[in-house]
């Protein structure tokens, strides 16, 4: 994924939860599924919007932790546990978990604002506004489709 690309989560997971000592899969919290699955209607609608507007995107797994990803070691760690991960961030799985608990449909999208490279802090500051604007534009088009 490159800066400016969009990831639509078909599912989300935590990549910093470790209850394996209690017999759980890595990433799974007690009483919760390992993956929180997005509403397929929402995923398909976003896929349509992104294709129509020629925005490079992928559909797939987004993982969440409580810390900013910077450095090769963290990237390797996440990939070892979730090899199919498309993006990592700090909020999505919590949103998905809340929607799951409330039995509400959801989807999470991410416009890539940085990579987990060594200079991620600098890249994030440079591109966070651009990524946010793109996410907002995509969301507005998505809402038009649902209307």
Tell where the protein language model's regions lie, with residue ranges:
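Glycine-rich phosphate- or other oxyanion-binding loops that anchor nucleotides, phosphorylated ligands
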Residues: 1-147
């Amino acid at each position: 994924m490159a800066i400016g690309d969009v990831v639509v989560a078909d599912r989300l997971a935590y990549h910093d939860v470790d209850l394996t000592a209690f017999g759980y899969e890595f990433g799974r919290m007690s009483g919760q599924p390992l993956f929180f699955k997005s509403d397929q209607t929402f995923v398909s609608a976003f896929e349509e919007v992104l294709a129509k507007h020629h925005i490079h995107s992928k559909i797939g797994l987004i993982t969440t932790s409580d810390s900013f990803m910077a450095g090769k070691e963290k990237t390797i760690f996440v990939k070892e546990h979730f090899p199919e991960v498309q993006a990592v961030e700090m909020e999505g799985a919590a949103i998905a978990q809340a929607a799951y608990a409330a039995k509400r449909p959801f989807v999470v999208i991410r416009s890539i604002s940085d990579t987990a490279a060594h200079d991620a802090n600098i890249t994030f500051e440079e591109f966070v506004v651009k990524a946010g604007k793109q996410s907002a534009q995509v969301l507005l088009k998505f809402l038009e489709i649902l209307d």
